[in-house]
């Protein structure tokens, strides 16, 4: 297994974790569900069925603070692996997702509310094929709209996640994810690594 380094996953994880420390108490969130907004949980989309090895640099903004991370992602048709490091090179989290089951290890210094499913959900919303994401979101009452330069996730006609893309395609581009429901944003620089 290759060692991974990139920022999107860990930053999303930390930011979603900060946001999910006080979720709507009326819903129970499963380990394989991602929290899009307070009270809105969706099952994780399945792996895309493709082979991807990508490195990401992530800068996240939450409540006046800035966080930076690195992550490396490896996906095969049946599995998704991620390793996230903080800017000191410390391993923050390792995630293995196979057959709808997620195994992970996390550093003790991560906030308690940091959830790998939220991190993977943000990765899917930004980088996975439109139809895969749209189908997963529809199952929980959310919709995905593609714009000329990004994506918008809506729940009850309210924007809960906005994604804007810069140059490039697929895993080889910069993206900016904003989640006004939880008050965070993530700037991602992603590059696919030749296999």
Predicted regions and their residues:
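Gly/Pro-enriched, hydrophobic low-complexity segments
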Residues: 140-195
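A mature extracytoplasmic/lumenal domain signature
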Residues: 84-88, 97-101, 106-109, 190-192
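Bacterial Sec signal peptide processing site at the extreme N-terminus
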Residues: 15-34
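A short, Trp-centered hydrophobic/proline-enriched beta-strand micro-motif
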Residues: 44-62
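Hydrophobic/aromatic beta-strand elements that line small-molecule binding cavities or substrate pockets
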Residues: 70-74, 93-95, 162-165, 188-190
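Sec-dependent bacterial lipoprotein signal peptides
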Residues: 1-18
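Acidic/charged, solvent-exposed loop-and-adjacent secondary-structure segments enriched in E/D, K/R, S/T
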Residues: 103-131
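Structural recognition of beta-strand segments within beta-rich domains
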Residues: 62-89
């Amino acid at each position: 297994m290759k060692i991974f380094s990139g920022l999107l996953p860990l930053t999303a994880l930390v930011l979603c974790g900060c946001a999910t420390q006080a979720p709507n108490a009326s819903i129970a969130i499963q380990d394989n569900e991602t929290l899009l907004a307070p009270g809105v949980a969706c099952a994780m989309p399945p792996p895309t069925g493709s082979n991807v090895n990508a490195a990401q640099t992530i800068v996240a903004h939450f409540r006046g603070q800035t966080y930076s991370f690195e992550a490396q992602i490896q996906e095969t048709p049946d599995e998704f692996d991620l390793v996230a490091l903080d800017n000191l090179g410390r391993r923050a989290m390792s995630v293995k997702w196979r057959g709808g089951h997620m195994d992970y290890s996390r550093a003790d210094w991560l906030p308690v509310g940091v959830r790998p499913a939220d991190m993977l959900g943000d990765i899917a919303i930004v980088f996975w094929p439109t139809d895969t994401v749209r189908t997963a979101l529809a199952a929980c009452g959310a919709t995905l709209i593609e714009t000329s330069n990004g994506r918008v996730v809506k729940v009850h006609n309210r924007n809960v996640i906005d994604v804007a893309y810069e140059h490039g395609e697929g895993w080889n581009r910069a993206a900016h994810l904003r989640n006004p429901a939880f008050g965070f944003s993530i700037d991602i620089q992603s590059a696919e690594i030749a296999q």
